Amino acid sequence: FEGGKQAVAECYRNIISSGGTPLAITDNLNFGSPEDPEIMGQFVNCIKGIKKACVELNFPVVSGNVSFYNQTDGKSILPTPTIGGVGLIKNISEHTAGKINENDLYYTIGETDTKTTALALLTELSQAPIENVNIKVNLEEEKRNGQFILRLFHEKLISSAHDVSDGGIA
């Protein structure tokens, strides 16, 4: 459930960080055998998470693809929801997102989550995926922060933004 929400929220943040208004997504869902009840449960919960995020963020699914039976020697891959999104930049000639200037100030907007940073570090150090870690996505906060950042872009109060995901802030 949370993995589906996370994938949608990450796409939403990426579009906003480039100064665009999120419009729609396409999904690509990769799972092991649907004949395994645990895998089917993961798939169903992932879709429920994607739906919840899309409804709350007003970010509809317009297309998608599902791939099952992704496994080797009877061992399934980890559930892999991949989300691609499109957004709109109303006036590209005034677009400044991504332009970093020498004297720019840096701000953190929203809550920071040490679990995200710690998870990325632990995965790197162990050189193996860490399973069953459940980092919750606050969709209300995602939407509020996203609208705030877009307003800052539109009012030309910021020239760039970057979302914080896997690696956290260093």
Per-range role (PLM):
Residues 1-170:
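Glycine/proline-enriched, intrinsically flexible loops and inter-domain linkers
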